[in-house]
Amino acid sequence: MTNHWIDIKNADAVLIIGSNAAEHHPVAFKWIMRAKDKGAVLMHVDPKFSRTSARCDFHVPLRSGTDIAFLGGMVNYILQSESYFKDYVLNYTNAAFVVGKDYAFEDGLFSGYDPKTRSYDRSKWAFEKGPDGAPLRDVSLRNERCVFNLMKRHYSRYSLKNVSDVTG
């Protein structure tokens, strides 16, 4: 988290994963409850029902160790349903940057992997550059190699069925 705890009171939704904030971080949880008092939706993702779960609108009891699959499913849903703030994505992230032709992701490994050194040649992931040396951008997000579309393709494997099979 990069904001001050007090700023949580301004949230529309709060997602708590793997923390019993009500018991272990009561001062921080005070600000979460202020957000709820103002209408925010509180979600708690944790295998164990706790005092935090009891105060939230939703408790999602995952199988232990599957939170990354759950988050991947959330990312996929947000991307597929276009539930993101497009102006923010275009102007404040690298989503529109076009990745070079050497980039690939196959069999669980990114391009540039050297099994002998067990390390990556990160130059394989470089952005395409324009004549001025700056990364090329596709603000339409239609280029199949822009970061946004590569991310959509990567997270598409986190379907509702796959995620629910893994997380329980």
Model region roles, listed by residue range:
Residues 35-42:
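A short helix->loop->beta-strand "cap" motif at the edges of active sites that frequently abuts
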Residues 16-22, 160-161:
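The substrate-binding groove and active-site-proximal loops of carbohydrate-active enzymes
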Residues 7, 34, 51-52:
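Hydrophobic/aromatic ligand-binding patch that stacks against planar heteroaromatic rings
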Residues 45:
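The conserved SAM/SAH-binding core of class I Rossmann-like methyltransferase domains
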Residues 1-14:
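Glycine-rich oxoanion-binding loops at beta->alpha junctions
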Residues 21-30:
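Glycine/threonine-rich flexible loop motifs
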Residues 48-167:
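Long, well-ordered, tryptophan-enriched scaffold segments
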